[in-house]
Design a protein with these regions (language model features):
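ATP-binding N-terminal substructure of ATP-dependent carboxylate-amine bond-forming enzymes
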Residues: 2-3, 11-150
Length: 150
């Protein structure tokens, strides 16, 4: 596996004043949507909230991207969808952000690294990695080149 920039605990990270923003992307349109949510819960619980600002970004079975800020347990049950706010990944490599849409207004939400926790199609085939590479957003996992192997 080729690993992109990964945020790991180090003295350099601890000395930084602001927290790095880590986005966990889960769900998706594949038949493994529920498995992805279960994996995301484990990842969200494992991330150190004192070191990182954690964003939960879920993709519904219909393909809608939502940012969710509620209890992690709702990710596993699927209740997160009721409380999510529409969000998109900006393809603009100079921004490195999500775009949150509220009341017709667009707010940029900067992100330092993405942890894609998508299973099946669009998650394990290199699609999400390719999207992140186009936006030049660092991510954890295999490089998009894996989509060329089959």
């Amino acid at each position: 596996h080729i690993i992109k920039k990964v945020l790991v605990g180090s003295r350099e990270d601890e000395s930084m004043v602001s927290k790095k923003t880590v986005a966990v992307i889960f769900g998706g349109q594949s038949s493994e949507h529920e498995v992805s949510r279960t994996s995301a819960v484990m990842m969200l619980q494992a991330l150190d909230k004192e070191k990182y600002q954690v964003l939960s970004v879920g993709i519904t079975k219909k393909g809608q991207w939502l940012i969710y800020n509620g209890p992690v347990e709702h990710v596993k049950t699927g209740e997160w969808e009721k409380f999510g706010t529409p969000v998109s990944l900006s393809p603009d490599a100079t921004k490195k952000c999500f775009l949150k849409i509220v009341g017709g207004n667009v707010k940029e939400i900067p992100v330092d690294v993405v942890i894609p926790v998508l299973h099946g199609a669009w998650g394990e085939d290199g699609t999400i990695q390719g999207l992140l590479e186009m936006a030049q957003i660092p991510y954890v996992g295999r490089a998009g080149i894996c989509r060329f192997y089959g």
